[in-house]
Regions:
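Short basic helix-loop element that most often maps to the first helix and adjoining turn
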Residues: 3-22
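Residues in the helix-turn-helix
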Residues: 18, 29, 58
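DNA major-groove recognition helix of helix-turn-helix/homeodomain DNA-binding modules
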Residues: 43-58
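Recognition helix of helix-turn-helix/homeodomain-like DNA-binding domains
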Residues: 25-38
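Short amphipathic recognition helices of helix-turn-helix/homeodomain-type DNA-binding modules
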Residues: 60-63
Length: 63
């Protein structure tokens, strides 16, 4: 699964830590998602989409 988390985070000028705090996960979880090493739960994907104001399928795509 590929994602645009790093890009969306840069557009909003958020650090990994700031994003992690907003969605209530660790900074390491955000790093793992950005690196493609971790696929987030549905709940986490929805929280991330809410932070960025985008649809889940605009942020996460199957390869």
């Amino acid at each position: 699964m590929i994602n645009t988390i790093r890009i969306e985070r840069a557009v909003q000028r958020l650090t990994q830590q700031q994003l992690a705090e907003r969605v209530q996960v660790s900074r390491q979880t955000i790093h793992a998602i950005e690196a493609g090493k971790y696929v987030p739960s549905t709940v986490l994907a929805l929280k991330l989409s809410a932070v960025f104001g985008k649809k889940v399928n605009d942020i996460f795509m199957l390869e």
